[in-house]
Amino acid sequence: MKKIIYLVAAFLCMACSDDHGSNQENGGASGSVTEVTPVTSDLSVDLSTDKAFYKPGEKVVFTADDALPAGTKVRYRLLGEVVGEESVVNGTSWTWQPPTTDFKGYMAELYRQENGTDVIVGTIAVDVSSDPARFPRYGFVADFSREKTAEKTQEEMAYLNRHHINWVQFQDWHNKHHWPLGGTRTQLDEVYMDIANREVYTSSVKNYIEAQHRFGMKSMFYNLCFGALKDAATDGVKEEWYLFKDASHTTKDSHDLPGGWKSNIYLVDPSNKEWQKYLNERNDDVYANFAFDGYQIDQLGRRSTLYNYNGIPVNLREGYASFIEATKQAHPDKSLVMNAVSRYGARQIGETGKVDFFYNEVWADEADFTNLKAILYENGVYGNYQLNTVFAAYMNYNKADNRGEFNTPG
């Protein structure tokens, strides 16, 4: 529901290493002196690749934004080791076949030689991974208006591709939380309204998916695991599925939204088997019409004590695990990621073994780097050290207009 400005992942530089921690980057044999070529930079060439990541054995296509002068060379590095070098003879585009070792990251350096000095004119990284979940770099899209044509979405995804974004979340793309499709399985609406009563064009959603897949990205549709709108009963959602603030099922729990929006969101029990079956059928409708690669599951963090229809207190954390298990069973070939809002339910989410990586939305009470360190440590334990972590990073509007500096662009 929030405007996520960037979704920052476990870092690509983790891939840019050898598995043995070697520190012999540039040194020669013991006691010898290695001749070092001076290096400087003049980063005047913008580079791009044709994909966000490459499976072992796939060829990389590089493109420069302008014709390169004669004598331009490119070398490929794995940390300090040069694993390949060649002249660029085709003006603006060339290909490279990386080593087939899985889960490695490389730096391509475009350079020219001047008076014995290597002048680097452009750089770009290459991720070679059979599974993008190993090094997830998560972006998002949130505007599905008429203007999102095939040409426009291709341009936007080219920008994300340049940042090596390999997963993309579709924020608030759906019609209703309990009925994601605009229309029905057999008859889609050309245009429908999202939760904020903004127009969503079905063609725009499809344009984004197609553009992302051209770059090898994974497309993930967003939805709560337990949301229903005010008209849910007409769509088959039962009263007995809801979460209540009292044991006598008088007051439903809800997430209240601004006036003028489509509806408040009323919460159902994510562990309710009938609800799980219902929503998985709706998800099946989604997959039948859109080439999504998986489901970005959301929650709302810690709630007060809640009860099911029978007056029994509900353990939401365990309910999330049950929901994930049922969702994976219904669509075993689709990816799952679930938001652990302020760590809530992170252990239960990770211990299912059914999510592709951890996703943590961190709020003001966990604003220090020590908090991020603690989350990374906990997620390592919960995921048996097999899953990486993505943090949802929100724009600091007080600093947004200030330019900063960063390392050599990759």
Where are these regions (language model features)?
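Aromatic- and acidic-residue-enriched carbohydrate-binding clefts of CAZyme catalytic domains
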Residues: 174-205, 233-270, 301-318
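Active-site neighborhood of glycoside hydrolase catalytic domains
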Residues: 271-358, 363-378
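Beta-strand-enriched, solvent-exposed domains that form extended recognition/catalytic surfaces
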Residues: 36-131
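Active-site-proximal substrate-binding groove within the catalytic cores of carbohydrate-active enzymes
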Residues: 338, 353-354, 369-410
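Sec-dependent signal peptide recognition
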Residues: 2-7
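Active-site-adjacent "subsite" loops/lids of carbohydrate-active enzymes
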Residues: 130-136, 142-150, 221-290
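An acidic-aromatic substrate-binding cleft motif
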Residues: 121-176
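Bacterial Sec-dependent N-terminal signal peptides
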Residues: 13-42
